[in-house]
């Protein structure tokens, strides 16, 4: 049975822009803006899977680390 969605962990890049890594798949992409990242993620998923085999839903999980003093 085919997967119904693929999840990407998205973080702000230390160099600027954003980085996205798929959970459970060897898919990584990056971009300067969030809109560009969405396009790059779609393209990376299309390139990774055979035609018609890609999950129909892509979920972007935004992760932001914040350090606070105790």
Segments predicted by a language model, with ranges:
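Short aromatic-glycine-(Arg/Gly/Cys) micro-motifs in beta-strand/loop hairpins
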Residues: 10-22
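Preference for short coil/turn "hinge" residues that link or interrupt alpha-helices
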Residues: 20-21, 27, 61
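A short, exposed loop/beta-hairpin motif centered on an aromatic-Gly-Thr core
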Residues: 25-35
């Amino acid at each position: 049975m085919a997967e119904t969605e693929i999840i990407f962990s998205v973080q702000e890049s230390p160099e600027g822009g954003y980085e996205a890594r798929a959970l459970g798949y060897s898919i990584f992409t990056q971009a300067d803006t969030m809109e560009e990242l969405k396009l790059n993620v779609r393209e990376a998923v299309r390139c990774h899977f055979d035609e018609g085999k890609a999950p129909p839903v892509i979920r972007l999980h935004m992760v932001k680390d914040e350090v606070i003093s105790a």
